[in-house]
Amino acid sequence: MESAYLPKSVDPERSADQGLEFAGDLDPAPLARLGELLAAQAGPISSRFGFRRDEEGRAVMVGSAEASLPLICQRCTDLFLFEARADWRRVFARSETDEQELAEKGLDVCYHGGPLDVAELIEEELILALPMAPRHPEGCEPVARPAGGIHPFAGLAELLKRETRDN
Ligand SMILES: [Zn+2]
């Protein structure tokens, strides 16, 4: 069963029982933490996710989100749209012990009853999908250094020369 909208919050246990799936767009405007990392306002985020149970009966959420995120290229310092894609799989542990065991296996695990904030989760996943050093994927020209001008370290070289002489 798939709903053509994103809910504000979901209950992983109940959704897993019903095998619920959701797909829709999310407005990035209220996502302040993501917004701080962007050079301009992002376009709509499209996401889909679903719930089911694993072999041991735990609720599992599998989802993805895509968005064009405006970033500053670190090579040419121009703005470009980074096509972000986040994929996640979260397991909902049944106890703290269960959570520890799953985390040791390297799984993305949570142990909290109650509903999940959908916007917060998608925001978190997109932040994780941001590149450490954003660059135009198609390549670009590095920022031109001032030609024929004063070398930025000229002053420093003079200073060093003077110090050597003084000692
Ligand atoms: Zn660039």
Per-region residue spans from a language model:
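Short cysteine-rich clusters marking metal-coordination/redox-active sites
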Residues: 73
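Charge-rich, low-complexity linker and terminal segments
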Residues: 1-19, 43-44, 81-167
